[in-house]
């Protein structure tokens, strides 16, 4: 059974923040589910998110194949940042799952923006960079940064005007239709908002379907909500009750391609991000190969 001792500088931390320190490869949503289900214990028994942590206390976690994979994984900050495209005004990097894009609670030091800033500092660049769109914490794929205020001012409106084509790969439970359009509204900030997603099945069997999806709107958790409502939640998605088998260390959702016109040069750009190794390896467990990822929705 994995266990950790609370050190002097960790006393008083929120339980989730403590666990993120100890298991940096684990998504916050996964750790929150462990706590919510009563799987994390201390000297007083089952711990809640509000339980105070005391110096010297032993924190016990359950035996779990998925947890062991997180514990064995390299910390995210030790993995080199992959640059997918760069010009004078634009930098596109391949975001792994887990790090937040911006500084936020639990991600003050290690977040994607901080990594990009560190990369440019190493080069001696003095550009002030900022991301111009977002990906959910557990989603991997290309993130577009503008170099300087003027570049950000030109790039941000591309997403607001929906001039960027966004493609995703997702593995979902069950056998879906071969292709279709999802138009059910999604809940965002307490309100139901219109959402539109096209999908095509790249591989299917009775257990699972590998889908390529194109987003026409950019609602938070759009793909996850719409597919779960159809009875096909994503593999690894605790929040929407997707299957979470031991061999899958994260949610199976990856942004695979961004297509847009460079507002500075006028050149058309198609930026592809390869399927992360941990997702590609898992596909064989559900009987799928890897020969179809380059196909696009027509």
Map each language-model feature to its residues.
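Pseudouridine synthases involved in rRNA/tRNA modification
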Residues: 1-33, 79-81, 203-208, 216, ...
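Short beta-strand micro-motifs in enzyme catalytic cores
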Residues: 91, 168, 209-211, 254-256
């Amino acid at each position: 059974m994995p266990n950790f001792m609370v050190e002097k500088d960790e006393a008083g931390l929120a339980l989730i923040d403590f666990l993120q320190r100890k298991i940096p490869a684990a998504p916050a949503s996964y750790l929150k589910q462990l706590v919510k289900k009563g799987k994390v214990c201390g000297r007083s028994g089952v711990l809640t998110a509000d339980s105070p942590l005391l110096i010297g206390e032993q924190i016990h976690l359950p035996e779990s194949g998925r947890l062991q994979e997180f514990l064995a994984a390299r910390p995210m900050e030790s993995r080199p940042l992959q640059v997918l495209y760069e010009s004078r005004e634009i930098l596109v990097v391949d975001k792994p799952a887990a790090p937040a894009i911006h500084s936020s609670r639990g991600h003050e030091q290690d977040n994607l923006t901080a990594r990009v800033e560190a990369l440019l500092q190493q080069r001696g660049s003095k550009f002030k960079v900022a991301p111009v769109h977002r990906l959910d914490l557990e989603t991997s794929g290309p993130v577009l940064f503008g170099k300087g205020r003027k570049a950000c001012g030109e790039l941000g409106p591309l997403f607001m005007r929906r001039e960027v084509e966004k493609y995703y790969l997702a593995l979902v439970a069950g056998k879906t239709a071969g292709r279709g359009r999802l138009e059910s509204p999604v809940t965002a900030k307490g309100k139901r908002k219109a959402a539109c997603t096209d999908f095509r099945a790249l591989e299917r069997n009775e257990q699972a379907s590998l889908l390529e999806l194109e987003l026409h709107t950019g609602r938070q958790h759009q793909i996850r909500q719409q597919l779960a409502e159809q009875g096909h939640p994503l593999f690894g998605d605790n929040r929407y009750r997707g299957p979470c088998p031991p061999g899958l260390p994260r949610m199976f959702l990856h942004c695979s391609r961004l297509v847009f016109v460079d507002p500075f040069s006028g050149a058309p750009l198609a930026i592809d991000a390869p399927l992360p190794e941990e997702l590609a390896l898992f596909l064989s467990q559900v009987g799928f190969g890897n020969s179809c990822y380059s196909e696009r929705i027509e």
